[in-house]
């Protein structure tokens, strides 16, 4: 029984151990050039060194700031708009093509437009990431409102609630689980777009810029360390929103 409990507790780490083990075997066998595939230990040392000398830490913080800012802007735009669109089918149907069109357009294809509008700098990176995140959040919020319980809406109207009260006291709460789903998806989209923008839109800092610099200089341990940092950041942000969702909308679907 004790062994079974230990195995159950270790289960989430088995995939990580298997991945590191496979990486170690490939690096030790030298099937690939050791310069291109260093050992996990070298990548770990590069990660520790990057945080110790604060170079990687600074880029990490810059990417967090850009991701957080873009997500906040996306939420401020998409959540109220999604509630309004979802509560009025006529308005939603009239704008459905526009929303789906831009949602289906690769955000990277919008880089030139945002560069023209905002120039080279943080504004462009944050704006293009906010654009991508807002579309994901908007779709989820509108979907949550459209699938809200009709009985609660009718009950509010019978009791004399105005359209505004129904909008914010019924639809907003009914769509809250989908709002959090949209925010979780939105923060992932924001992070991806921010890192890609840092790589290709004239940036001097951030994890994306650090990745490109390491790749161009063939500093493979630093490149893998930055990939680890970006992956850890994405996982942590998703975990934070999932934890908040479980705490505050545990009643979802009940």
Explain the meaning of each model-derived region.
Residues 3-5, 29-72:
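Periplasmic/extracellular loop-to-transmembrane helix junction in inner-membrane transport proteins
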Residues 58-66, 116-137, 180, 222-226:
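Loop-to-helix entry region at the N-terminal start of transmembrane alpha-helices
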Residues 127, 131, 164-196, 237:
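Transmembrane alpha-helices
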Residues 30, 129, 182-232:
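Non-cytoplasmic
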Residues 1-17, 239-254:
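Transmembrane alpha-helical segments of polytopic membrane transport and secretion proteins
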Residues 143-179, 211:
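Short cytoplasmic-facing helical segments at TM-TM junctions of multi-pass membrane proteins
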Residues 89, 146, 177, 181-184, ...:
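C-terminal transmembrane helix and the adjacent membrane-cytosol boundary/short C-terminal tail
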Residues 80-115, 129, 139-143, 148, ...:
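Cytoplasmic-entry segments and transmembrane alpha-helices of multi-pass inner-membrane transporters
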